[in-house]
Amino acid sequence: MTPDAQPIPASEPRHAHEVRWDVRVPVRDGLELSANLWLPLPSSDAPDETFPVILEMIPYGKDSWRRNADTSRGRWLAARGFALCRLDVRGTGSSPGVALDEYTEVETLDGYDTVEWLAAQPWCNGNVGMWGISYGGFTAIQVARLRPPHLRAILPMYATDDRYRDDVHIRGGCVTASEKSQYAVSQLGMNAMPPYPAFAGPDWRDRWRERLEATPPWLMAWVREQTDGPYWRRGSLAPDYDALECAVFQVAGWADSYVDPAFRIQERCRSAVSVRTLVGNWVHSFPSDAYPGPNLDWLHELVRFFDRYLKDIPNGWEHEPAITWFEHDYAAPEAFPAAWPGRWRAAGTFPVAGTTPSTWHLGDGTLAPEPAATDAVDTIRHRATTGTSGALSWGAGWHPNGLARDLRPDELHGATYTTEPLAEPLAVIGVPEAVLHVTASMAVATCVVRLSEVDADGTSSLVATGVLNLTHRLSDTDPSPMPTRGLATEEVRIPLRTTGYRFTPGRRIRLAVLTSYWPVLWPSPMTGELRVHHGPATPSRLVLPVLPASAPTLEPPAFRLDPPV
């Protein structure tokens, strides 16, 4: 904000509304998809008033388990002068067709056609936004890539720019296990649900049978496609970040798996009208109720964003910090923490101005600013079941998965490198990187690195994780086995998850190196050893993006607590 400006609150509720169930939206191949609409009604003093509309398109059945939540949110938005459109993706819910896979090209074109159809309705002011959490956030980004003329703004929450690098299928070239299986099974069940009989008509059973016979299990393609290529580029914004031109407001969470994409979009989407990112501690759920807190009134922020870009209200949105994050402190590890301690911080760019790399060298169980004096090697025998002290999914965090516990049981089966107790706080914002010199006796090996803070009692609390299938060390499109003969080491660079954290004086920083992360990733099917080399000839190290206390930052926005909706 400029020094003399104050942010304007979101639109207040002043409209009655009507609901239109099962509105049919025509798309270019002749299908008519099913949508539910919550429409604000013009006030008596402005009978010709028209309204912007916010579209959410997902395959989770708007007329079944999502209906109550949609109704609550639709009423709330309509009262504030926004129409809400909930569209069933083709082949799901009450929409006809077949859902052959997630994020197909025809599905994205359906989104484009729906945006333009909505903009042409007599009750619409011609301005359309999209929003969604997870799948709905993905589709918002994917449709925005096509640049529909009337799509002004999108709000993706916990979404990705790169389906290969950051989704439930592949991580660091490793095939995921728990999360891919959970999602594949749940989506198989949802795709098998019948269309809503009241909307589908008397032949709903026949349509249901056709859907059951024609819809494949999506898992088959995910298992088959283990290297990057055209399959994963479909639906990915990367590498064409300039395709995103509308205004963007992103929501992400440190405890979720989609935090890296938010920071990449913030950094690389230079053609967008504006890009703004909000990162809390949260798992894969709404900031009003997700753990760990603190929580906030995310709907108020949603309405302020859409007020600016769908209603053209000059509320100061574009003058507020581009990135706001919760810098969290040490918390004793637990699966379902109510909140993490810390503070909100803000900056105008990412990478955050003033951030400097801080290098910590691996030694004989040590992590130090100075390189080790002698060369040495640590040998880790591969154990496929190591990993269960961490979170049981890459980022969903829902019951019964939860977040990471005390990491020490896993660390017994790896190599650990630990600093002396810190004398000063150390604030990190950005992407930590482990640079390791390794050899292996396995042609297929996984390297898992965990960054943690160690309390005085020895408890090791997770800060961030990075993984690499070492066959992908040179390429995600053309993997190559690790050499198992000879003495030459290979330098591998393993980025950890983007992190906003403050290490506290008196505690220690630890880097642990493991060979598996079960049940999150499928382990290497081979037996053998991974060796980590360190010393003058093989300078393995951890590089942290440190924000000095003297670095200039901005005043974070003053968020509201969440009201009942």
What are these regions (language model features)?
Residues 7-49, 418, 422-424:
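N-terminal cap/lid segment of alpha/beta-hydrolase-fold proteins
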Residues 5-9, 278, 292-565:
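C-terminal, loop-rich substrate-recognition/catalytic regions characterized by aromatic stacking residues
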Residues 260-275:
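Active-site-adjacent alpha-helix of alpha/beta-hydrolase-fold enzymes
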Residues 122-134:
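Alpha/beta-hydrolase fold nucleophile elbow
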